[in-house]
Amino acid sequence: TFRRVGVAALLLASVGLGACTQHVVRVSPDQAIDLSGRWNDVDSRMVADALIQQSFEAAGGDNWVSRHTRGSGGDRPTVIVGTVRNRSMEHVPVSTFVRDLERAYVNSGAVRVVSSRGERDEIRDERDDQQEYASADTRARLRMETGADYMLQGEIQAMEDREGGRSVGYCQVDRTLTSRESSERVWVGQHRIKKFIDRPRFGL
Protein backbone atom coordinates (compact mmCIF):
# COMPACT_ATOMS: atom_id res chain seq x y z
CA THR A 1 0.00 0.00 0.00
CA PHE A 2 2.74 2.42 0.99
CA ARG A 3 4.61 1.53 -2.19
CA ARG A 4 1.55 2.32 -4.32
CA VAL A 5 1.09 5.63 -2.54
CA GLY A 6 4.74 6.47 -3.13
CA VAL A 7 4.53 5.63 -6.83
CA ALA A 8 1.36 7.71 -7.18
CA ALA A 9 3.03 10.64 -5.43
CA LEU A 10 6.02 10.43 -7.77
CA LEU A 11 3.74 10.35 -10.80
CA LEU A 12 1.83 13.41 -9.59
CA ALA A 13 5.08 15.24 -8.89
CA SER A 14 6.44 14.47 -12.36
CA VAL A 15 3.21 15.67 -13.98
CA GLY A 16 3.35 18.86 -11.92
CA LEU A 17 6.96 19.51 -12.88
CA GLY A 18 6.14 18.89 -16.52
CA ALA A 19 3.30 21.38 -16.38
CA CYS A 20 5.64 24.02 -14.92
CA THR A 21 8.34 23.60 -17.57
CA GLN A 22 9.19 26.94 -19.14
CA HIS A 23 8.62 27.22 -22.87
CA VAL A 24 10.21 30.09 -24.82
CA VAL A 25 9.28 30.96 -28.39
CA ARG A 26 10.96 33.69 -30.43
CA VAL A 27 8.50 36.03 -32.13
CA SER A 28 8.78 39.03 -34.41
CA PRO A 29 9.47 42.30 -32.55
CA ASP A 30 6.62 43.83 -34.56
CA GLN A 31 4.07 41.26 -33.35
CA ALA A 32 1.49 42.63 -30.94
CA ILE A 33 1.32 40.52 -27.77
CA ASP A 34 -0.78 41.76 -24.85
CA LEU A 35 -0.45 39.75 -21.65
CA SER A 36 -1.51 42.21 -18.97
CA GLY A 37 -3.12 45.01 -20.97
CA ARG A 38 -0.53 47.48 -19.71
CA TRP A 39 1.57 49.84 -21.85
CA ASN A 40 3.99 47.85 -24.00
CA ASP A 41 6.44 48.18 -26.89
CA VAL A 42 3.71 48.04 -29.53
CA ASP A 43 1.79 50.85 -27.80
CA SER A 44 4.95 52.97 -27.68
CA ARG A 45 5.70 52.53 -31.37
CA MET A 46 2.07 52.87 -32.50
CA VAL A 47 1.41 56.03 -30.48
CA ALA A 48 4.67 57.66 -31.59
CA ASP A 49 3.93 56.98 -35.27
CA ALA A 50 0.34 58.22 -34.94
CA LEU A 51 1.31 61.44 -33.16
CA ILE A 52 4.10 62.33 -35.57
CA GLN A 53 1.76 61.68 -38.49
CA GLN A 54 -0.82 63.92 -36.79
CA SER A 55 1.74 66.69 -36.43
CA PHE A 56 2.16 66.84 -40.21
CA GLU A 57 -1.55 67.05 -40.96
CA ALA A 58 -2.46 70.38 -42.50
CA ALA A 59 -4.98 72.71 -40.91
CA GLY A 60 -6.74 74.57 -43.70
CA GLY A 61 -4.30 73.25 -46.28
CA ASP A 62 -1.21 74.45 -44.42
CA ASN A 63 0.92 73.13 -41.55
CA TRP A 64 3.79 74.31 -39.38
CA VAL A 65 6.42 72.54 -41.51
CA SER A 66 5.41 74.30 -44.72
CA ARG A 67 5.08 77.65 -42.95
CA HIS A 68 8.55 77.29 -41.45
CA THR A 69 10.06 76.18 -44.76
CA ARG A 70 8.61 79.20 -46.56
CA GLY A 71 9.79 81.59 -43.87
CA SER A 72 13.33 80.20 -43.72
CA GLY A 73 14.12 80.11 -47.40
CA GLY A 74 13.50 76.40 -47.84
CA ASP A 75 15.25 75.03 -44.73
CA ARG A 76 13.62 72.12 -42.91
CA PRO A 77 12.58 72.83 -39.31
CA THR A 78 14.72 71.38 -36.52
CA VAL A 79 12.99 69.63 -33.61
CA ILE A 80 14.16 68.51 -30.19
CA VAL A 81 12.10 65.94 -28.27
CA GLY A 82 11.82 67.30 -24.75
CA THR A 83 10.24 66.02 -21.56
CA VAL A 84 7.63 63.26 -21.54
CA ARG A 85 5.93 63.20 -18.14
CA ASN A 86 4.33 59.96 -17.01
CA ARG A 87 1.28 61.05 -14.98
CA SER A 88 -0.09 57.52 -14.76
CA MET A 89 0.42 54.83 -12.12
CA GLU A 90 1.79 52.48 -14.78
CA HIS A 91 5.46 51.84 -15.37
CA VAL A 92 6.09 53.44 -18.77
CA PRO A 93 9.66 53.30 -20.18
CA VAL A 94 9.70 56.96 -21.18
CA SER A 95 13.13 56.78 -22.81
CA THR A 96 11.87 54.11 -25.23
CA PHE A 97 8.90 56.29 -26.15
CA VAL A 98 11.20 59.28 -26.73
CA ARG A 99 13.33 57.17 -29.08
CA ASP A 100 10.21 56.07 -30.97
CA LEU A 101 9.20 59.72 -31.39
CA GLU A 102 12.67 60.66 -32.63
CA ARG A 103 12.69 57.70 -35.02
CA ALA A 104 9.32 58.66 -36.48
CA TYR A 105 10.43 62.26 -37.04
CA VAL A 106 13.79 61.30 -38.58
CA ASN A 107 12.21 58.68 -40.85
CA SER A 108 9.66 61.21 -42.10
CA GLY A 109 12.42 63.20 -43.79
CA ALA A 110 10.41 66.38 -43.21
CA VAL A 111 12.32 67.67 -40.19
CA ARG A 112 15.74 67.49 -38.58
CA VAL A 113 16.14 66.17 -35.02
CA VAL A 114 18.83 67.27 -32.57
CA SER A 115 20.09 65.49 -29.46
CA SER A 116 18.63 65.94 -26.00
CA ARG A 117 20.29 68.05 -23.33
CA GLY A 118 22.00 65.12 -21.60
CA GLU A 119 23.27 63.69 -24.86
CA ARG A 120 24.61 67.08 -25.94
CA ASP A 121 26.71 67.30 -22.78
CA GLU A 122 28.43 64.02 -23.65
CA ILE A 123 28.98 65.15 -27.24
CA ARG A 124 30.43 68.46 -26.06
CA ASP A 125 32.86 66.69 -23.75
CA GLU A 126 34.05 64.60 -26.69
CA ARG A 127 34.37 67.69 -28.87
CA ASP A 128 36.39 69.48 -26.20
CA ASP A 129 38.73 66.50 -25.94
CA GLN A 130 39.22 66.57 -29.69
CA GLN A 131 40.50 70.15 -29.53
CA GLU A 132 43.44 68.94 -27.47
CA TYR A 133 44.08 65.41 -28.71
CA ALA A 134 42.70 65.02 -32.27
CA SER A 135 44.53 66.07 -35.42
CA ALA A 136 43.54 69.40 -36.96
CA ASP A 137 41.95 67.83 -40.04
CA THR A 138 39.71 65.46 -38.01
CA ARG A 139 38.65 67.50 -34.97
CA ALA A 140 35.10 68.88 -34.85
CA ARG A 141 34.69 72.64 -34.95
CA LEU A 142 33.39 74.49 -31.89
CA ARG A 143 30.14 76.45 -31.77
CA MET A 144 28.70 74.78 -34.87
CA GLU A 145 25.71 73.03 -33.28
CA THR A 146 22.30 73.20 -34.92
CA GLY A 147 19.79 74.94 -32.68
CA ALA A 148 16.27 73.55 -32.41
CA ASP A 149 13.43 75.61 -33.84
CA TYR A 150 10.74 73.64 -31.99
CA MET A 151 10.43 71.49 -28.87
CA LEU A 152 8.08 68.51 -28.59
CA GLN A 153 6.74 67.98 -25.05
CA GLY A 154 3.86 66.16 -23.42
CA GLU A 155 2.53 63.70 -20.90
CA ILE A 156 1.00 60.25 -20.51
CA GLN A 157 -2.11 59.63 -18.42
CA ALA A 158 -3.91 56.37 -17.73
CA MET A 159 -6.89 55.05 -15.80
CA GLU A 160 -8.45 51.66 -15.18
CA ASP A 161 -12.03 50.58 -14.49
CA ARG A 162 -12.17 47.13 -12.90
CA GLU A 163 -15.02 44.82 -11.94
CA GLY A 164 -14.34 41.24 -10.93
CA GLY A 165 -12.05 39.62 -13.47
CA ARG A 166 -12.76 42.21 -16.14
CA SER A 167 -11.23 45.64 -16.61
CA VAL A 168 -10.94 48.44 -19.12
CA GLY A 169 -7.62 50.23 -19.45
CA TYR A 170 -7.50 53.72 -20.94
CA CYS A 171 -4.35 55.61 -21.86
CA GLN A 172 -4.13 59.15 -23.23
CA VAL A 173 -0.96 60.70 -24.65
CA ASP A 174 -0.90 64.47 -25.21
CA ARG A 175 1.87 66.22 -27.15
CA THR A 176 2.57 69.86 -27.93
CA LEU A 177 5.06 71.38 -30.35
CA THR A 178 6.28 74.83 -29.33
CA SER A 179 8.43 77.41 -31.10
CA ARG A 180 11.66 77.93 -29.15
CA GLU A 181 11.81 81.57 -30.22
CA SER A 182 8.25 82.79 -29.76
CA SER A 183 6.86 80.12 -27.35
CA GLU A 184 3.92 79.77 -29.75
CA ARG A 185 2.25 76.38 -29.82
CA VAL A 186 2.30 75.40 -33.47
CA TRP A 187 0.68 72.00 -32.97
CA VAL A 188 -1.28 70.18 -30.24
CA GLY A 189 -1.99 66.47 -30.62
CA GLN A 190 -3.53 63.59 -28.73
CA HIS A 191 -3.70 59.82 -29.14
CA ARG A 192 -5.79 57.45 -27.03
CA ILE A 193 -5.66 53.71 -26.39
CA LYS A 194 -8.46 51.65 -24.84
CA LYS A 195 -8.15 47.97 -23.95
CA PHE A 196 -10.64 45.45 -22.58
CA ILE A 197 -9.03 42.81 -20.36
CA ASP A 198 -10.96 39.67 -19.37
CA ARG A 199 -9.10 37.68 -16.70
CA PRO A 200 -10.62 34.20 -16.28
CA ARG A 201 -11.32 33.02 -12.76
CA PHE A 202 -10.24 29.54 -11.79
CA GLY A 203 -12.19 27.76 -9.10
CA LEU A 204 -11.32 24.57 -7.22
Regions found by a protein language model. Name each.
Residues A136-R139:
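Acidic/proline- and glycine-rich, intrinsically disordered low-complexity segments
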Residues V5, S36-N40, N86:
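Residue-level detector of alpha-helix boundaries and kinks
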Residues A50-N63, D75-A134, S182-V188:
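N-terminal segment of the mature soluble domain
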Residues C20-G74, R141-D149, E160-Y170, D174-L204:
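C-terminal/domain-edge helix-coil "capping" segments
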Residues T1-C20:
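Sec-dependent bacterial lipoprotein signal peptides
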